[in-house]
């Protein structure tokens, strides 16, 4: 499989190219973990490219006008798709990576989607590895990539659950037999591996669990940064709760806001920092008004320096319906934060004693009681604990380098 490229330690005329397949390159969990890894790569040896998904449109006057004025951007590497610039676009391009575009998969466009994938891989023969993080359609694009001559195809499970309804059912359907369609199967946790690849694949040892590693040093607790961040937000003396995540069903924001409202009944100095963006943001802003907490909730959007906001927080909240292995929970622990987390989240994410698991079947008041009980504590440097638990991206990057160059995944 790896015979077409130079082995580790050999001279290479140019970098091998690894294609990561994702929904997009916004500030999401999988995207952020891949970017953490990308920054650690020697790009003279290994270069990352990205294949993302966007809505296919007819190029009428209005569409071309939006492209011309920069409010929407047609990627010249796309196929009839128009996409808005996303969070990581500039950094990827600055590091020498390319962003390619496929039409979003909608089930009804199954045949046109397959056609677009075939056309893409027929035109691009430069990839030595295709790593599919978008497992909902990996059963389609990985076999096509393999038949097109890509030496190695990888399916990487990044989540442990699907949304409700027909969309979730479709995801389950198209994931069937995925373990047999990839040369390597990776999962961010046992839970994610079981959900995506199935119990049999996990028990057979076919799936390798690779934790979502972070740049631990960037998040290490710093009292000076904490004071500066709180002063800038005007919350110097407040009890600061926080959450980082997309505004979407999975993250369970309605419940989170109800928990915060219950905290506010007991602590008049409490505030909530919400980092992230998404389609449900407007609805959550309205819910804040309904709960009477709008003036105490800070909708901060996507932030390049999210690590500063972790320093400002006192308690981190993650009441998700499901997760793979949430990188934000690892980041929060790296910042020395106490974390209140849904018991649906894998225990593999607990790298320190700072994590408390609670059921989202409990009343919001029960969560509020636990938050207030644990609110007074001394922050500490947890970097060594995170490193020893396998969450340091610098160490993980060495294993990935070996894998990309030789096919040996044992060191990841």
Functional labels for PLM-detected ranges:
Residues 14-112, 206, 279, 403:
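N-terminal strand-loop element at the rim of the active site
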Residues 117, 220-235:
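A short helix/loop element that forms part of the nucleotide-sugar donor recognition site in Leloir-type
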Residues 132-138, 157:
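Short His-centered aromatic/hydrophobic patch
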Residues 182-220:
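A short, active-site helix/loop in glycosyltransferases that binds the activated sugar's phosphate group
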Residues 285-301:
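Nucleotide-activated donor-binding/catalytic signature segment of Leloir-type glycosyltransferases, i.e.
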């Amino acid at each position: 499989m790896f015979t077409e490229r130079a082995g580790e330690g050999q001279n290479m005329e140019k970098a091998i190219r690894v294609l990561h397949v994702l929904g997009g390159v916004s500030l999401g969990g999988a995207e952020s973990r891949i970017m953490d890894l990308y920054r650690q790569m020697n790009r003279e040896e290994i270069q990352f490219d990205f294949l993302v998904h966007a809505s296919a449109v007819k190029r009428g006057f209005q569409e071309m006008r939006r492209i011309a004025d920069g409010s929407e951007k047609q990627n010249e590497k796309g196929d009839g798709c128009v996409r808005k610039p996303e969070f990581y676009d500039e950094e990827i391009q600055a590091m020498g990576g390319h962003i390619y575009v496929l039409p979003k998969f909608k089930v009804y466009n199954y045949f046109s989607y397959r056609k677009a994938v075939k056309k893409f891989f027929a035109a691009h023969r430069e990839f030595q590895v295709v790593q599919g993080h978008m497992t909902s359609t990996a059963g389609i694009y990985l076999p096509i990539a393999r038949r097109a001559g890509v030496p190695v195809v990888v399916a990487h499970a990044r989540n442990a659950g699907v949304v409700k309804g027909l969309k979730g059912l479709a995801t389950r359907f198209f994931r069937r037999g995925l373990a047999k369609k990839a040369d390597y199967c990776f999962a961010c946790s046992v839970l994610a591996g079981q959900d995506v690849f199935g119990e049999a694949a996990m028990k057979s040892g076919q799936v390798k669990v690779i934790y979502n590693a972070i740049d631990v040093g960037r998040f290490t607790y710093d009292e000076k940064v904490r004071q500066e961040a709180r002063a800038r937000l005007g919350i110097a003396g407040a009890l600061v709760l926080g959450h980082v995540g997309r505004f979407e069903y999975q993250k369970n924001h309605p419940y989170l806001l109800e928990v915060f409202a219950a905290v506010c009944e007991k602590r008049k100095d409490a505030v909530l920092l919400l980092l992230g963006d998404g389609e449900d943001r407007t609805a959550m802003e309205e819910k804040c008004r309904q709960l009477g907490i709008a003036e105490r909730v800070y909708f901060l959007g996507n932030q390049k320096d999210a690590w500063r906001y972790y320093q400002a927080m006192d308690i981190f909240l993650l009441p998700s319906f499901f997760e793979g292995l949430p990188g934000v929970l690892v980041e929060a622990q790296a910042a020395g934060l106490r974390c209140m987390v849904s018991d649906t989240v894998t225990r593999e994410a607990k790298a320190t004693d700072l994590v408390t698991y609670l059921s989202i079947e409990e009343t919001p008041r029960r969560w509020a009681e636990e938050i207030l009980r644990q609110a007074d504590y001394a922050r500490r440097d947890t970097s060594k604990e995170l490193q020893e638990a396998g969450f340091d991206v610098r160490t993980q990057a060495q294993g990935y380098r070996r894998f990309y160059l030789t096919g040996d995944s044992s060191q990841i």
